[in-house]
């Protein structure tokens, strides 16, 4: 099923800028910050890329998508349901515990947490990377040029605000499928 998904994405004109095999070992143990997230199409493109660069890639998706027949398919594809409304749901702790087991694990998260414009990104992706001691790897969705690629790893410094500003500043409004839904950081 994954190969079919990747093939369909390529047929839609997407170019995957893939690192040379084995050249980026950090891609097997990291948190991907995938942005700009302004469309449901981000999921199709992002997962097709993740499956090509990770040995064990997981994608966090809001639980509402798991209702009905799509649920088993999403679980089979390595997706994890997120209950964003439940404060008792410790997804950061669960993700950190998974990393602590060792071995390949990469988690893709859209830090905006919504396809709507947001001024403040969610902090969970930073917390997971910081607590697990793994890098954050920016993953760029460029709808204008139909390209997706990853940037250099960013290790958390302990200064969440500075790290978030650094990461957010990498993503540009013109890359988004719906630029009006992405709030770019002004330098």
Locate predicted features.
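Soluble catalytic domains of membrane acyltransferases
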Residues: 14-173, 187
